């Protein structure tokens, strides 16, 4: 009987933890991708208008800092909202367990039965889990939350800031460190190579086809650089 009560309660947090790790990794890849594309668009666009290394560096750094701070702030707000929702759900569950324990036991039994357990086994499992840790049982089975592993907005913000910054540094350094005659070529090639890598990672993490992911990622980056370079060149030709 003990074995039959383990899967619903103990296996789910492991699955959630794996899902959380994959979500963090996917977010890091996408953050780096955003840094690559947005900063590449900025420095290539400016390069279309001027050859000044100082101007390119200033524009690139401004874009890097603005983008990384925006990503971090957005992630902080988003994850803080999620954490508040998780806390509120746990508080409600705690109150319901205190005020109506029998109804909550019935609810847990029904949830376990819905996962394929017989009514008798589900009842026994629910009783054992309730005696062990009622809040944790309901949080895991009913809410899909680990009370000891709530999302951390500061970690999320820091990860987004770092991912975007790492991605943004590639086109910025390629542009300002390369010789003038090779500046655009080195930047475009390095950006497309990096986008191929992040596209491959995104496809692998999402169990999707690699080819279309590479085409979308590299095509989007190439389009961004082409449009911004054309805009910069037009401004230069207009004497702006």
Whereabouts are the PLM-identified features?
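Transmembrane alpha-helical segments of integral membrane proteins
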Residues: 170, 189, 193-208
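C-terminal ends of transmembrane helices
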Residues: 76-80, 146-147, 199-209
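Internal alpha-helical transmembrane segments
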Residues: 2-78
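Transmembrane alpha-helical segments and their cytosolic interface motifs
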Residues: 24-43, 147-173
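Small-residue-rich segments of transmembrane alpha-helices in multi-pass membrane proteins
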Residues: 167, 216-229
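Juxtamembrane boundary at the C-terminal end of a transmembrane helix
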Residues: 229-240
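Hydrophobic alpha-helical transmembrane segments
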Residues: 28, 56-61, 154-161, 184-189, ...
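Cytosol/matrix-facing amphipathic helices and coiled-coil assembly/linker segments
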Residues: 2-27, 79-161
């Amino acid at each position: 009987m003990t074995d039959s009560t383990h899967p619903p309660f103990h296996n789910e947090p492991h699955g959630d933890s794996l899902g959380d790790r994959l979500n963090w990794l996917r977010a890091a890849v996408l953050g780096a991708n955003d840094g690559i594309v947005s900063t590449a668009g900025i420095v290539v666009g400016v390069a279309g208008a001027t050859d000044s290394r100082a101007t390119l560096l200033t524009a690139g750094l401004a874009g890097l800092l603005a983008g990384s701070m925006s990503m971090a702030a957005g992630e902080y707000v988003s994850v803080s909202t999620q954490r508040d929702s998780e806390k509120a759900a746990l508080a409600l569950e705690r109150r319901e367990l205190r005020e109506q324990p029998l109804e909550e036991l019935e609810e847990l039994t029904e949830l376990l039965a819905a996962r394929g357990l017989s009514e008798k086994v589900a009842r026994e499992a629910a009783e054992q889990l309730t005696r062990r840790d009622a809040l944790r049982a309901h949080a895991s089975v009913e809410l899909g939350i680990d009370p000891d592993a709530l999302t951390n907005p500061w970690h999320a913000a820091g990860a987004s800031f770092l991912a975007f910054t790492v991605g943004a540094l590639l086109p910025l350094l390629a542009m300002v460190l390369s010789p003038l005659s090779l500046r655009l070529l080195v930047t475009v090639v390095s950006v497309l190579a990096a986008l191929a890598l992040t596209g491959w990672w995104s496809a692998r993490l999402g169990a999707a086809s690699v080819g279309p992911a590479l085409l979308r990622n590299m095509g989007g980056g190439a389009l961004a650089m082409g449009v911004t370079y054309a805009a910069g060149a037009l401004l230069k030709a207009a004497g702006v």
